[in-house]
């Protein structure tokens, strides 16, 4: 099994410094351009299947990368972005900070992610890791996927959570990627 993970392209809320979470924000013009550049770099990869977050920014990115190829696309909510609850849509950068908690507490999202407490109705990093681990375990255990090349379109935090489940250094949650980056893994017993 060969897995290619991609993070969605840029959205208007990325540019504005707003927390997106599970709010369905589509790609902006630059996000579409970034996805097209990624598609160019991945055009020779013979994908058998695509699994995507149901959020439009991830699905749009996947569809652009696939470029009209006849590849089945499956949506899976377990690879949606972390839910920030009632903080979604709120500015979270120092210049537009509007989160109803002291900025020092919010910064734990970056400095101590496992101690981060989201807004009401949101989920913790541990909850995100749990649902993405269920996804990982199911996909990598399916015998019908054993010889497949699979594109997985997801989100920055969700992708980090998936990878967190397989990294040796469990304390290091944040590994850097940029919008529409891709991560290539081979999964085997």
Language model features with spans:
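Extreme N-terminal starter segment of soluble prokaryotic enzymes
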Residues: 1-4
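Short, conserved phosphate/pyrophosphate- and ester-handling motifs at nucleotide-, phospho-/glycolipid
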Residues: 8, 155
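Loop-to-helix element that buttresses phosphate recognition and phosphoryl-transfer chemistry
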Residues: 10-61, 121-133
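Phosphate-coordination/substrate-recognition cap region in phosphate-metabolizing enzymes
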Residues: 39-106
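Glycine-rich phosphate-binding loop signature in dinucleotide/nucleotide-binding domains
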Residues: 44-46, 139-147
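Short glycine/proline- and acidic residue-enriched helix-loop micro-motifs
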Residues: 105-127
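GST superfamily/GST-like fold recognition
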Residues: 156-160
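Conserved small/polar residues in nucleotide/adenosyl-binding loops
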Residues: 183-189
């Amino acid at each position: 099994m060969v897995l290619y993970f991609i993070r969605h392209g840029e959205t208007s809320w990325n540019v504005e410094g707003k927390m997106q979470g599970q709010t369905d924000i589509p790609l902006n013009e630059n996000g579409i351009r970034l996805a097209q550049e990624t598609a160019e770099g991945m055009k020779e990869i013979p994908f058998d299947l695509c699994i995507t977050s149901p959020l439009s920014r991830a699905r749009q990115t996947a569809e652009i990368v696939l470029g009209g190829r006849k590849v089945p696309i499956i949506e899976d909510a377990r690879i949606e972005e972390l839910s920030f609850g009632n903080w979604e849509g709120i500015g979270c950068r120092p210049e537009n900070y509007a989160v109803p908690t002291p900025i020092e507490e919010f910064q734990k999202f970056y400095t101590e992610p496992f101690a981060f407490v989201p807004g009401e109705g949101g989920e913790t990093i541990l909850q995100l890791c749990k649902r993405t681990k269920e996804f990982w375990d199911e996909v990598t255990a399916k015998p019908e996927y054993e010889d497949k090349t699979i594109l997985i379109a997801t989100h920055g935090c969700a992708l980090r959570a998936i990878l967190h489940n397989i990294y040796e250094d469990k304390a290091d949650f944040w590994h850097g990627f940029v919008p529409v980056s891709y991560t290539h893994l081979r999964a085997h017993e």
